[in-house]
Amino acid sequence: MKLEQRYEGKAKKVYATENPLEYVVEYKDDATAFNGVKRAQIVGKGQINNAITAHLFPLLEEAGVPTHFLEKLSEREQRVRAVTIIPVEVIVRNVAAGSFAKRLGLEEGTPLARPVVEYCLKSDALGDPLINTDTAVALGWASEDDLKRIRELALKVRDFLTPYFAARGIRLIDFKLEFGRTHDGQIVLADEISPDTCRFWDAATNEKLDKDRFRRDLGGVEDAYAEMLRRVTGEGGRDEG
């Protein structure tokens, strides 16, 4: 049973429960880009992201990646382990795209010879600036051991998801992960894996099936999210209500 709201972010609300070691997460339809500068609603996004995350996190657990996920409660809600989020976001890149391609003068779609792992400070106010391990350790955001474990888990996520999506006709271009620490100090994957946090391209056409359709005003955002839901879970489209 969910109690008072503990936190509201751009895409989710987090509620306390009767168990102090568990939260309820509610997924919203709110869409933001450029650290909240651009805002809109994507019909059914909350349901779709909840469903995709609830499908993928148990598979990642089986693949050896501990997560905060416990169970899907409803169309928009899931029960999770309570964690303290580590304020270092991890980006894993298989292909040059987005800010990475722009920053380095690369053509979007350029394959990378090996996965690139980048770290950002989790701060909308500062625009999620890139940081390195020395900065994270020096400023107390994470320890060297934390970052070593986070990198190990992020690459394990990549090694599982890349072929998983490929088998469904999807190229996993890059993705963002967040990790948290449980009450007993275990580092686990938190947040979500969805078209909000990943770049997905159709393997045959390179059509974008993710939030870039919203960021870049490409249209067809709801249809792209519904298509990802269908390919990942086999479920149908979105609820228009």
Swiss-Prot record:
The keyword Ligase applies. The keyword Acyltransferase does not apply. GO terms for molecular function: ATP binding; phosphoribosylaminoimidazolesuccinocarboxamide synthase activity. Keywords: ATP-binding, Ligase, Nucleotide-binding, Purine biosynthesis. It comes from the Bacteria. One of its GO terms (biological process) is 'de novo' IMP biosynthetic process. PROSITE patterns: SAICAR_SYNTHETASE_1, SAICAR_SYNTHETASE_2. Pathway: Purine metabolism; IMP biosynthesis via de novo pathway; 5-amino-1-(5-phospho-D-ribosyl)imidazole-4-carboxamide from 5-amino-1-(5-phospho-D-ribosyl)imidazole-4-carboxylate: step 1/2. Its EC number is 6.3.2.6. It catalyses: 5-amino-1-(5-phospho-D-ribosyl)imidazole-4-carboxylate + L-aspartate + ATP = (2S)-2-[5-amino-1-(5-phospho-beta-D-ribosyl)imidazole-4-carboxamido]succinate + ADP + phosphate + 2 H(+). Belongs to the SAICAR synthetase family. NCBIfam families: purC (TIGR00081). This is Phosphoribosylaminoimidazole-succinocarboxamide synthase. It comes from Deinococcus geothermalis (strain DSM 11300 / CIP 105573 / AG-3a). The lineage of its organism: Bacteria, Thermotogati, Deinococcota, Deinococci, Deinococcales. The gene is purC.
